[in-house]
């Protein structure tokens, strides 16, 4: 390698170092800044998405209150839950983007500036030292040749001249090798930086692929069920038809004005275990009064008529149905796919004897103003201890702990609530607790599951049974109403992660007061 080639390679080496320091690092800083803007924008999208699907949950609550659209309410709940899981995957991708890319690049670029500056100075100093040694040998050889030309005996300088030539050749070889190695080192440093960037970007891409794959998997699984649920908008569920027939059999005819009022103001919902009956609008009070006067129609917690089992959410259909009704639409698919963390819903046929017994035990009341949860959510007191174990969706508590119920009704004997002591949320067996009255005293809770057992039926026959106030017997089951701003507490809130179900890493946790306020709206 000639000296000119060595100098050219030296300039290339310096250019590589300067390119890294003057172009790569500033560009990397700009990339990090743009990445932070991107992260901030995605965080804003995530927050907006939570609000959007929170509103979707609210629409699902509204639909689930209706006898005609209850299945669609379950579908809306499933949609919100699926998209909540997708949003959780997006948040995981954002965490990876922040921790594995932006943070590490930001640390590297600060350390890299000082490291490259020191590496370039070291290379330049070593190259200059070797170049100076070569120049010195060449200068000595030049002087020696001048002496040899002016000497009468030039042969005596020949041996020394050969020594200088060998020294120059060795030093020039060392310089060329050093410059070559320096150029290789500079290219390696440049490549390492680009490889680091690509490696971190691949980690982000991997999480992005998992995010999209999770979304595709969930949506592909649920979408056909959702589409089937809304395939026939004109089909009225059997329970709504039976309700109309019950009204007709109780009064001789179906009142158009009553049905019209129920469409706009009246919401027909499933019974809430242990809760007071909902208030009835003034325009329906005379109508309900006439129904109360009929002694031949048994009442069970506000459900009038012989077909009261048809409105029980734990029973699919009564064995003897009018033949004119269309075949009952199975709801087991929607119930089973509602959440993979809920206990499996079973179909149990209630006994009419219990309904009659409870009707006799709990007399009706003329007061229709005893609304559900007038002073807030229902509270229960633990009468037994319960351990969740490894299941993060269950709630642990000890005897005597107070629990605030966060959903309106129990599902197969399981309720969802928040421990006032530990501030943890989760599902728990409702039979382990007693419902607290508004004054804070506890009373015996009688769930639908207990109402179906013979042991509880025998308990009702005892004289020393504490009977609730007369308002509990109000026959408002067929005519409950709620204002437009009143909804059931959502079982799957997108805005409150403590309600989440289905992700292993999203279990019960301590909830801040701000989360509680959001959940309460």
Curated annotation (Swiss-Prot):
Keyword Cell wall biogenesis/degradation: no
UniProt topology in membrane: Peripheral membrane protein
Biased composition regions of type Polar residues, renumbered to the chain: 349-368, 447-458
Residue(s) carrying Phosphothreonine: 341, 361
Modification after translation, per record: Phosphorylated on tyrosine residues by INSR in response to insulin treatment.
Keyword terms of this UniProt record: Cell projection, Coiled coil, Cytoplasm, Cytoskeleton, Membrane, Phosphoprotein, SH3 domain
InterPro entries per record: AH/BAR_dom_sf, BAIP2_I-BAR_dom, BAIP2_SH3, I-BAR_dom, IRSp53/IRTKS/Pinkbar, SH3-like_dom_sf, SH3_domain
Residue positions where Phosphoserine is found in the record: 262, 324, 326, 337, 347, 367, 385, 396, 455
Presence of the UniProt keyword Membrane in the record: yes
Domain SH3: 375-438
Example GO BP: regulation of cell shape
Subcellular location: Cytoplasm; Membrane; Cell projection, Filopodium; Cell projection, Ruffle
Coiled-coil regions listed: 132-153
Record GO cellular component, one term: membrane
Pfam families in UniProt: IMD, SH3_2
Domain IMD: 1-250
S-S bonds: none
Recorded superkingdom: Eukaryota
GO molecular function: cytoskeletal anchor activity; proline-rich region binding
Annotated Low complexity bias: 321-335
Record's subunit section: Homodimer. Interacts with CDC42 and RAC1 that have been activated by GTP binding. Interacts with ATN1, ADGRB1, DIAPH1, EPS8, SHANK1, SHANK2, SHANK3, TIAM1, WASF1 and WASF2. Interacts with ENAH after recruitment of CDC42.
Protein purpose: Adapter protein that links membrane-bound small G-proteins to cytoplasmic effector proteins. Necessary for CDC42-mediated reorganization of the actin cytoskeleton and for RAC1-mediated membrane ruffling. Involved in the regulation of the actin cytoskeleton by WASF family members and the Arp2/3 complex. Plays a role in neurite growth. Acts syngeristically with ENAH to promote filipodia formation. Plays a role in the reorganization of the actin cytoskeleton in response to bacterial infection. Participates in actin bundling when associated with EPS8, promoting filopodial protrusions.
Protein name, entry field: BAR/IMD domain-containing adapter protein 2
Source organism per UniProt: Cricetulus griseus (Chinese hamster)
Lineage: Eukaryota, Metazoa, Chordata, Craniata, Vertebrata
Gene coding for it: BAIAP2
